[in-house]
Amino acid sequence: KKLFIFVFITLICFGNFFYGKTTIEKNKKVKATFLDYNIKIVSPKISINRFFQNEEPEDTILDLIEISKPNKLENTIFIFPEGVLSNIYLQDIKNYKYIFSNHFSDKHKLILGLNSDENQKIFNSLVVLDNELNIISKYNKNKLVPFGEFLPYENLLSKFGLKKITQGYKSFSSDNKRKIINLNDISFLPLICYEIIYSGKLINNKKYFDFILNISEDGWFGDSAGPHQHFSHSIFRSIEEGKNLIRSTNNGISAFINSKGQIIK
């Protein structure tokens, strides 16, 4: 009986090893997409306290622009994290056009996380904007964090004074549509925050996008192993899906990861 258990465990270990090796070898054959764009990941360390303070966002916007160092002559996609402009809703972003248009050109595209308000529902959204802050595309988060983004049994528990952890009195709503965003000659699968942890459940058809994009606010983890664990999930997903992955975080680990799970930058 002991010999059987030993052999069984050994077969499982070797099976996992060879499956992983085969998957990595297969992913070596994935063709790279060569873009006419530079891609800049913007990875600030803006305090999580902003979620609980009614701060004017102009200084934060200027800080993000300074980190971005935009060159108006270069085709560039700037990728900002989730929620860095927590006091601005998508519907109000054009109020700050005068700042953005002074620093970005028509050669630039901006990707960032913003809250959006649609039909009296609030969504955690990833948006693609041009330098005039016109909306090119938008994705609403599918998988929400319980108690962080929504309060389960809200109608009942709110009567006892409970609410979600993040700012605002109202829970976020989830969208049930997984979306591929097409931007000129490239396409990507957008994932917001912990949507990256769902192994094997990102999307059914992997053929129709070039890479995975994950934006996140990791300041909620504080000084813990959380940001490193969250980052590890990104590596696992890139290997499983056989896709390059770009990750932009605030207070976390940002990186370019190739389809073999190797950190390129």
Question: PLM features: residue spans?
Answer:
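Enzyme catalytic cores with a strong preference for nitrogen-chemistry domains
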Residues: 1-265
